[in-house]
Swiss-Prot record:
GO terms for molecular function: flavonoid 3',5'-hydroxylase activity; heme binding; iron ion binding. Its cofactor is heme. It is found in: Membrane. The keyword rRNA processing does not apply. This is Flavonoid 3',5'-hydroxylase CYP75B138.
Length: 527
């Protein structure tokens, strides 16, 4: 049966009428309770402020905060959204965050993270704590990180050798892509006992390496797509009755990329199982040993839960660090005086006959300041992952309704001139002795600088991320000088952002690595 033009017009008219009626009814109910809500911009019927967020919500929310203040409220469809845009307001939400440790329902968790079976979007409770504990003990905690330090350093040595060989060809390298391969192999070795891209680590060129590089490019594209789609403000998440229509086509894309990722996970996990050594203590082996056991929430650890956790770690653990490193190298190429000073510091501490190790980093205060400044300007997650209020509460004299979604605009706080003088200037000296940020660290205790979040649901990979970013940036600038492609100057490097859960460069950094160490430094001991 087909619909006539009149049927379609009547159908659309009914939807519009019901939408306006529903919006007015709900809005009047909110206003009639007499409670003081945070200020915020006026929205549209049905969609509220959703159309005003645009393609870069972190920037739109920053602009709104200049008008409505550091604590504001928006309406996204039928959902209350509260946004913290200052350290003092963020602290009120996150210092005692028992009321904001839940996650709001979202399509990304449903369709890409195995229906909330993962760690990032799992409901706060016993199952979440179990997954977090297993990840910490066997991958992300201090002892596990120390045990796998040699793995990370070996993969950085492989990266240095690859860049050394590529430097002879005269072609620029895609920095983000190479960082992603390095991060993925290091993480998969630590987590599952083998590399995802083994042939790229072995090197030697040829058809097999070309095919593996194509596989690596496809994997990175898939990871970026997951992170991008997960950051989309999907209308169906905020206007429930529009969810079946998938107006933006987001759910269709999520399901498609999930199918691709699921095929990859099934194949790679099966390969890891078949090659696992008896008594292996890596995270995947431990998770397999936990299959069928209670997850603490009335369920059990299943193959789906294992895949969901591996997806979390391989996606967030590689995309965030590689994009952060790409931003850092971009800033250093744009500021050659800062780059030269950092190279001199590393040369003095390490020399030019070997690569940097993680143990060298504590002796490199200027490098540490560079990394902090990069975290300030280019946080991996511009908006904190969304939280949801379990109960109504009062913050800063304003009423926060139950089930409100909370975002902390980390990106905006890093560029706030009331906190950071000349915030658009890349100035690592802010974090050196005598600078305003000399006492700040990035582990969630100082809300002026919180690239990994804070509170109970701070990024589980904070410690790993800190180590990886420091050692990789140090290796890149110690082992190589960097030259831009012909016709491109530092002033003309594109600095546009591509929004998602993580903040990508819209245009990848392409640059020529120029070796600056003794040749023997580029010959890694392979495992």
């Amino acid at each position: 049966m087909t619909m006539t033009s009149l049927d379609i017009i009547l159908f659309i008219s009914a939807i519009v009428f019901l939408s306006i009626y529903y919006y007015n009814l709900f809005s009047n109910a909110k206003r009639s309770n007499g409670l003081k809500l945070p200020p915020g911009p006026k929205g549209y019927p049905v969609l509220g402020n959703l159309p005003q967020l645009g393609a870069k919500p972190h920037q739109a929310l920053q602009a709104f905060s200049r008008v409505y203040g550091p604590l504001m409220r928006l309406r996204l469809g039928s959902v209350d959204l509260v946004v913290a845009s200052s350290p003092s307001v963020a602290a009120q939400f996150l210092k005692n965050d028992s009321n904001f440790c839940a996650r709001p329902p979202n399509s990304g968790a449903e369709h890409m993270a195995f229906n909330y079976h993962d760690l990032v979007f799992a409901p706060y409770g016993p199952r979440w704590r179990l997954l977090r504990k297993l990840s910490a003990v066997h991958l992300l905690g201090p002892k596990a990180l120390d045990d796998n330090q040699n793995v990370r350093e070996e993969e950085l040595a492989v990266l240095a050798r690859m860049l050394y060989e590529r430097s002879r060809g005269g072609e620029p390298v895609n920095v983000g892509k190479e960082m992603h391969v390095c991060s993925t192999n290091a993480l998969s070795r630590a987590m599952m006992g083998r590399r995802v891209f083994e042939k790229l680590a072995v090197g030697g060129g040829g058809v097999e390496e070309e095919e593996e590089m194509k596989k690596a490019e496809e994997f990175k594209d898939m990871v970026v797509e997951v992170m991008t789609l997960a950051g989309v403000f999907n209308i169906g998440d905020f206007v429930p009755w529009l969810k079946p229509f998938d107006i933006q086509g987001v759910v269709r894309k999520m399901k498609r990329v999930h199918r691709r990722y699921n095929v990859f996970l099934d194949k790679f996990i099966a390969e890891c199982r078949s090659s696992a050594k008896p008594g292996a203590n890596d995270l995947l082996s431990v998770l397999i040993g936990q299959r069928g056991k209670s997850d603490g929430s009335g369920g059990e650890i299943t193959d789906t839960a294992i895949k969901a956790l591996v997806l979390n770690l391989l996606t967030a653990g590689t995309d965030t660090s590689s994009s952060t490193i790409e931003w850092a190298l971009t800033e250093l190429i744009r500021h050659p005086d800062i780059l030269k000073k950092a190279q001199q510091e590393i040369d003095s501490a390490v020399g030019r006959d070997r690569l940097v190790t993680e143990s060298d980093v504590p002796k490199l205060p200027y490098l540490q300041a560079i990394v902090k400044e990069n975290f300030r300007m280019h946080p991996a997650t511009p908006l904190s992952l969304p939280r949801m209020s379990i109960e109504e509460c009062d913050i800063g004299g304003y009423h926060i309704p139950k089930n409100s979604t909370l975002f902390v605009n980390i990106w905006a706080m890093g560029r706030d001139p009331s906190i950071w003088p000349d915030p658009m200037e890349f100035r690592p000296s802010r974090f050196l002795p005598g600078g305003q940020g000399e006492h700040l660290e990035v582990r969630g205790n100082h809300f002026e600088l919180m690239p990994f979040g804070a509170g109970r649901r701070i990024c589980a990979g904070t410690s790993m991320g800190i180590r990886v970013v420091h050692s990789t940036v140090a290796t890149l600038i110690h082992a190589f000088d960097w030259k831009l492609p012909e016709g491109l100057t530092a002033e003309k490097i594109d600095m546009e952002e591509a929004f998602g859960i993580s903040l990508q460069k819209a245009i990848p950094l392409m640059a020529h690595p120029i070796p600056r160490l003794a040749p023997k430094a580029y010959s890694p001991k392979m495992k």
